[in-house]
């Protein structure tokens, strides 16, 4: 059977490119997953592939190849994918769609330094090109520790899989953390780019795949309502919070030595800051979006002195959800003298005309009060209030809160008169909820991002410069913490250490209670 070659810019010839009503469907292609035995592949990647197929967004001849150090047959691999899909898929299970997807499954056993295994992988993909018409177009998903990226990329290069000929394409997908600091990030980027050109590298930040994060662009640039007040004249400060209520039991191998700042602030929260603070791009072309994010990150720096504008903590024993939980140092796998922070908060300044003088407060942590991610623009108080103090006792500051998860949506908080004969003003909320406004469920972030990889659409993926600028911003705080003692303890189920509360109180502000 003659291979079916498809151009990198494959388009459905029956569809008008201006028609936005129909979803984009990937052309002939396949995907190889390295690290198929890990949690990421099992809980996120495999279910997302099935959900895309179930929604009709993958080509009928799509192939999925697993690579791991296991003595498995293709049938064994298929069972692993089946179990993952049954447990974690978002859409209903349909046997017919599953059977069609499973026809494209293959498995290659081997280690990352095994030349023969990669030769077998190349042979397997060549057969799939001939038998299923994948067209020589393959995405390589590295669901593996970053230390293994260079050796896998080199093996893909040696086996001829990294640089396809003609109109075929090869793309590599890598997961955070993108390095440990600026120096290691540059080293990692250099190793990956030695094999794959930058336009073929897709760095997954799953927060950018969330509908509410993408809605920041619509909220800001499709509505005249918000732009006039989206600046230092009206905004007092911005709070970006990612809180989790879970602990780290069983994750010591990954988390110990990394900590909350490297795990979340360097990537997720810096990207949320960039989307919140960037200027309007000339278009939604990937290069235009990336240019604006790079500009705002270039203008961002840590506020000083760092002992007053940053905070780090480590959760101690406490109560969470009605249960008594242990502290980090009593979790399995953590040394009793571990200095890994489970809470981090920093103050950033964005030195642009729009944001000069507006502090951006970023915080993240484990074992906090509840699971929530939000961006809150807190506005300045009205310059003159013709009310006496008793009328406004319960009045706070106006705020716009973008809820990323859970209960995705937007809340506007403002003052309103309480019904009655007296002039009493109290805060009220105006709510927009995705779940109420739209009948269709939001797709899982990995669905959108994997589809974008297969389509060659890089808008939602950070480039080298963004990654390195984020490290450049964060590194001074990491170095300061390393040189100054241990993290402050905070009780599980609370909202972080006292030092984080004091960080805002020094300036007359308070953290929002999500």
UniProtKB/Swiss-Prot annotation:
**Where does it sit, as one GO cellular component term?**
plasma membrane
GO process terms (BP): glucose metabolic process; pentose-phosphate shunt, oxidative branch
Q: Which residues are involved in binding NADP(+)?
A: 69, 176
Reactions this protein catalyses: D-glucose 6-phosphate + NADP(+) = 6-phospho-D-glucono-1,5-lactone + NADPH + H(+)
Q: Give the pathway annotation.
A: Carbohydrate degradation; pentose phosphate pathway; D-ribulose 5-phosphate from D-glucose 6-phosphate (oxidative stage): step 1/3
Q: Which HAMAP family match?
A: G6PD
Give the family this protein belongs to, as stated in its UniProt record: Belongs to the glucose-6-phosphate dehydrogenase family.
This one is known as Glucose-6-phosphate 1-dehydrogenase 2
Organism name:
Mycobacterium tuberculosis (strain ATCC 25618 / H37Rv)
């Amino acid at each position: 059977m003659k291979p079916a070659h498809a151009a990198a810019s494959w388009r459905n010839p029956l569809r008008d490119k201006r028609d936005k009503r129909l979803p984009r469907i990937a052309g002939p292609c396949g995907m190889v997953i390295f690290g198929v035995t890990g949690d990421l592949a099992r809980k996120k990647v495999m279910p997302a592939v099935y959900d895309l197929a179930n929604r009709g967004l993958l080509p009928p001849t799509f192939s999925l190849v697993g690579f791991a150090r296991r003595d498995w047959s293709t049938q064994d691999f298929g069972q692993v994918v089946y179990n993952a899909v049954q447990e974690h898929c978002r859409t209903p299970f349909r046997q017919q769609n599953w059977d069609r997807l499973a026809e494209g499954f293959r498995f290659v056993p081997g280690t990352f330094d095994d030349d023969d295994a990669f030769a077998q992988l190349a042979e397997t993909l060549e057969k799939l090109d001939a038998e299923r018409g994948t067209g020589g177009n393959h995405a390589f998903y590295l669901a593996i520790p970053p230390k293994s990226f260079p050796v896998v990329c080199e093996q893909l290069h040696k086996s001829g899989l990294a640089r396809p000929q003609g109109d075929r394409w090869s793309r590599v997908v890598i997961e955070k953390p993108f390095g440990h600091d600026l120096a290691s990030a540059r080293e990692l980027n250099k190793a990956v780019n030695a094999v794959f050109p930058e336009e073929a590298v897709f760095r997954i930040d799953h927060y950018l795949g969330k509908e509410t994060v993408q809605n920041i662009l619509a909220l800001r640039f499709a509505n005249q309502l918000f732009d006039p007040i989206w600046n230092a004249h009206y905004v007092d400060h911005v709070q970006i919070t990612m809180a989790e209520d879970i602990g780290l039991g069983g994750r010591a191998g990954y988390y110990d030595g990394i900590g909350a700042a490297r795990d979340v602030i360097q990537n997720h929260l810096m990207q949320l800051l960039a989307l919140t603070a960037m200027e309007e791009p000339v278009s939604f072309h990937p290069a235009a979006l990336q240019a604006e994010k790079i500009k705002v990150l270039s203008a961002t720096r840590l506020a000083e002195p760092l002992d007053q504008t940053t905070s780090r903590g480590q959760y101690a024993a406490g109560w969470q959800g009605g249960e008594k939980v242990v502290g980090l140092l009593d979790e399995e796998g953590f040394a009793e003298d571990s200095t890994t922070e489970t809470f981090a908060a920093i103050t950033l300044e964005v030195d642009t005309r729009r944001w000069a003088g507006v502090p951006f407060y970023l915080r993240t942590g484990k074992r906090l009060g509840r699971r929530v991610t939000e961006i809150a623009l807190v506005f300045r108080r009205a310059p003159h209030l013709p009310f006496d103090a008793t009328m406004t006792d319960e009045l706070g500051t106006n705020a716009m809160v973008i809820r990323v998860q859970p209960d995705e949506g937007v809340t506007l908080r403002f003052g309103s008169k309480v019904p009655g004969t007296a002039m009493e003003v109290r805060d009220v909320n105006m709510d927009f909820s995705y779940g109420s406004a739209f009948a269709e469920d939001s797709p899982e972030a990995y669905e959108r991002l994997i589809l974008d990889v297969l389509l060659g659409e890089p808008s939602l993926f950070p480039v080298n410069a963004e990654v390195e600028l984020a490290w450049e911003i964060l590194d001074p705080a990491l170095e300061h913490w390393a040189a100054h003692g241990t993290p402050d303890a905070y009780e599980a189920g609370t909202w972080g250490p006292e030092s984080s509360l004091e960080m805002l109180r020094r300036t007359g502000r308070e953290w929002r209670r999500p």
